[in-house]
C-alpha cells in the first residue's frame, strides 16, 4: 500500500510539473513577443468569427483555429452550434513555422478565449504531434468570468484583455485564418 501511495504521489507531482511547464501568463507571453525572440510562434487558436466579435491582438503571429464552428449543425442540448476540431490544425501550424523558418523545436504559444477549452488542448495536441515546446496562455484572451455580483458572467477577471495588453476590435487580414486566400 505504501508503494502505491508513493507511486501516486510521484505521478501527481509529474502532472503538476507538466501543467506548470505548459502554461504561460499573458504578461509572460507578451514579454517574449516584445523581445522578438526568434524561436517563438504565437498563434490565436480561436475561430475567426469569434475573433471578429471579441477582438484580436496584433502581437499574435497568426490565427490557426483549433476548433471550428459548423453553423449547419445545431446542438439542441447545449444550445450552440457544433464545434469540431480543425482537421488541418497541425499542418497549418507546420506551415506557419515554415513561413518563419522555424523548426519543430520552436516555442509555439497558443491562445484561446479562456485558456482551458482550446488553448491547453491545442498545446497538448501539438506536443503529442512532435512539437515539444508547445505552450498556451493561461486564462487566454478574455480570461475568467466573474462568479458573483452585478457583473457575474462577464469575463473581466484576467487574461490578455484584462491585463492591459494590446488588443483591438479589428482583425489583421494578413494574420487571420481566411479560406478565401489561404
Residue ranges and their predicted role:
Residues 1-4:
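Positively charged n-region of N-terminal signal peptides that target proteins for export
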Residues 6-9, 74:
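Short helix-onset patch at the extreme N-terminus, typifying the N->h transition
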Amino acid at each position: 500500500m505504501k508503494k502505491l501511495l508513493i507511486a501516486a504521489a510521484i505521478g501527481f507531482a509529474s502532472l503538476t510539473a507538466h501543467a506548470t511547464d505548459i502554461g504561460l501568463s499573458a504578461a509572460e507571453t507578451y514579454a517574449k513577443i516584445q523581445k522578438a525572440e526568434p524561436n517563438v510562434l504565437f498563434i490565436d487558436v480561436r475561430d475567426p468569427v469569434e475573433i471578429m466579435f471579441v477582438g484580436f491582438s496584433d502581437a499574435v503571429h497568426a490565427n490557426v483555429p483549433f476548433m471550428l464552428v459548423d453553423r449547419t449543425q445545431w446542438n439542441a442540448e447545449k444550445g450552440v452550434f457544433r464545434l469540431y476540431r480543425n482537421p488541418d490544425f497541425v499542418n497549418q501550424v507546420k506551415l506557419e513555422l515554415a513561413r518563419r523558418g522555424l523548426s519543430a523545436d520552436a516555442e509555439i504559444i497558443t491562445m484561446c478565449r479562456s485558456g482551458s477549452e482550446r488553448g491547453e488542448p491545442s498545446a497538448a495536441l501539438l506536443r503529442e504531434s512532435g512539437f515539444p515546446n508547445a505552450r498556451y496562455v493561461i486564462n487566454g484572451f478574455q480570461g475568467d468570468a466573474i462568479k458573483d455580483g452585478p457583473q457575474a458572467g462577464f469575463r473581466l477577471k484576467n487574461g490578455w484583455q484584462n491585463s492591459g495588453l494590446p488588443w483591438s476590435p479589428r482583425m489583421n487580414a494578413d494574420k487571420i485564418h481566411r479560406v478565401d486566400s489561404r
